[in-house]
Structures are given as structure tokens and as C-alpha cells.
Amino acid sequence: MDENKQKALAAALGQIEKQFGKGSIMRLGDNRTMDVETISTGSLSLDIALGAGGLPMGRIVEVYGPESSGKTTLTLELIAAAQRVGKTCAFIDAEHALDPIYAKKLGVNIDELLVSQPDTGEQALEICDALARSGAIDVIVIDSVAALTPKAEIEGEMGDSHMGLQARMLSQAMRKLTGNLKQSNCMCIFINQIRMKIGVMFGNPETTTGGNALKFYASVRLDIRRTGSIKEGDEAVGNETRIKVVKNKIAAPFKQADTQILYGQGFNREGELVDLGVKHKLVEKAGAWYSYNGDKIGQGKANACKFLRENPAAAMALDTKLREMLLNPAELIVEEPILSEMPQEEEL
């Protein structure tokens, strides 16, 4: 660039910073805030599938799946993990179905968790926006998008048609929320439900509620499904669960995590550690015996898990080794939302 252009650019940058504040424009290489901070999901397998060690701060995340697949459990596990590292969390319970006893069992500090049960979708999204703008909240969970009912629909009659009303409400909310969440480095997780499209002969008939806006604005989209039951004798004690990373703007997408959700306990962390440890040669398996660092830790997977549960220092050391081995920061992609890619009103 010649000298005159450099002077003109410097003057323009100075004028922009004077008018809009320092940091309003910068060179990409100078932006230290591009390093994305993440919070663990509570599942090592999912953290590895996400590629960054967890879900990103300052971004919108969508978690969707069929009923009883583990969507709320996943978000409560993340809240518990966030609280353990000193983060402040809020739960906007539009479904009016949050169970504090279950949340406590998963490790959530319910005395510190902010909870709102709004009457309308607009109220829920305004509360979310106000919390984000405060700069004091680190994680907001909205459960669920399908329960964000527009005020006009609540005040209307049962048979009234409200075509596209919820989609327009969400589209407007996304435009407001995205910048506020980024500025305050606050993560917002939307739990969503699945619906079936009518008349689809080929391809996947499933879709999520609330229009297209959330799909565009979300940096990460997770599809969570129950794949089987875990039984002890004849009694079901948990679910085999598969979580697919359908969209990922911070690392490579389309990876998946297979994990277990135990009733009343959440993710089977010790089971994940044993399975991943064996797969990556950190835990030795000879017959039915499992060994770690040359010491036998149990006969059978259940006993190996019990050893790790009773020895948290050994479990933490194994977790750290696996994260160092499987999470490569060089693979991270940091992709900011591009306004021109966002859906316009007619695309809802």
C-alpha cells in the first residue's frame, strides 16, 4: 500500500475509533479476543467431538432431539461444570418443568442458579437479552424454543392461526442477542424440539421449531438421540446416547460422541474415561482386568469405574492426559457470524 493510502486508512481508522470506541475496528491478527474460551459439557467424549474442549463462550448454541433424549440433562451438566469454575448461570424455564432435585443430583448449585419462568416468548427473550447486557451472566439456558409462545397467541383463541409469528419473534431476538452475547462473553443455549414436515417422500422429514433464524445464528448445533437402554438385571438404569455435532463454527463439524446417561446421575464420566483410556492405550485391558499406570484398577468395567469414582485424583490425571492427547488447538477454526448470511424476513 502506498504512503497516501496508508495515511488515509490511518485517518479513517482514527475517526471510526473516535466515533464508535476503541476496538470497534482492528486488524484480524491483532485481535486477541479471537481465542475462544470454552466450558466443558461434562462429557469428555462430547468435549473431544466438539474439538475445542467444550462449548464456546459468547456464542449461541442449539441442542435438539426427540423427547427424553437427554437435552435438559446435557445443559444441566454444563451448568454444573460452569459453576465449578466460578461462572454465573441462568435457566429460563419456558416449559415450567425444571426439577430442582434432579438438577442438584447432577451437581448444580441450585442456590446460585438464577431461574425464570416467563409467561410469554417475548418476555423470555427480553429477560435473556437483559441478562446478557448486564455482563454479569456467563451461561443462559432457554428450555425450550417450542415453549416460547408469542403473546398474541396466548391472548388469542384456541383455533386462531398465527402463521410465522414465532419465527418472526425469534428472528428479531437473534439479531439483538448475537452482538450482546459476544460483547458480554455470555453463552446462550437454546433447547429445541423436533417436528415432522408433512409430505416429505425423500430425505429427512424432521425439522426443528422456530424457523430458520436459530439455525443460522447458532455457532454449534447438537443432535442428541437415545440409542439404547443400560440395564442391571431386568432394571433399566440409564440410556445409551449418541450426540452428533451437526454444525460447528469453532472446529471441524460432523463428529459424534457415544456416551451413557445414568438416571439420577447424569453422564457416566468414569465409563467414558475407561473406554477412551483403553482405546488410546492409556488404560491396559487384559482379559477382564483393567490396569492404569501398571496397577490393576478392577476386574470388569463396572469395578474399574468404581475405582476411578473412589479415586478422583487418578480420574483427573487420566482425563487431563486424554484431553492433551486428543484436543489439538491447531485444528480450531474461529468463524464469526456474517450478517449477510443471516436469513431475512422472507426466509423464515
From Swiss-Prot:
Q: Which PROSITE patterns match?
A: RECA_1, RECA_2, RECA_3
Query: Member of which family?
Result: Belongs to the RecA family.
From the Swiss-Prot or TrEMBL record, state where the protein is found: Cytoplasm
| Chain positions recorded as ATP binding sites | G65, P66, E67, S68, S69, G70, K71, T72
HAMAP family for this protein: RecA
Q: Which keywords accompany this UniProt record?
A: ATP-binding, Cytoplasm, DNA damage, DNA recombination, DNA repair, DNA-binding, Nucleotide-binding, SOS response
Superkingdom of source? Bacteria
* Pfam families in UniProt: RecA, RecA_C
InterPro entries (alphabetical): AAA+_ATPase (IPR003593), DNA_recomb/repair_RecA (IPR013765), DNA_recomb/repair_RecA_CS (IPR020584), P-loop_NTPase (IPR027417), RecA-like_C (IPR049261), RecA-like_N (IPR049428), RecA_ATP-bd (IPR020588), RecA_C_sf (IPR023400)
Q: Which PANTHER family match?
A: MITOCHONDRIAL DNA REPAIR PROTEIN RECA HOMOLOG-RELATED, RECA
Any one GO biological process: SOS response
Identify the GO cellular component terms for this protein: cytosol
Q: What SUPFAM superfamilies does its record include?
A: P-loop containing nucleoside triphosphate hydrolases (SSF52540), RecA protein, C-terminal domain (SSF54752)
Protein name (database record): Protein RecA
Q: Which Gene Ontology molecular function entries are recorded, alphabetically?
A: ATP binding; ATP hydrolysis activity; ATP-dependent DNA damage sensor activity; damaged DNA binding; single-stranded DNA binding
Q: Does the keyword Nucleotide-binding apply?
A: yes
Please give the function described in this protein's UniProt entry: Can catalyze the hydrolysis of ATP in the presence of single-stranded DNA, the ATP-dependent uptake of single-stranded DNA by duplex DNA, and the ATP-dependent hybridization of homologous single-stranded DNAs. It interacts with LexA causing its activation and leading to its autocatalytic cleavage.
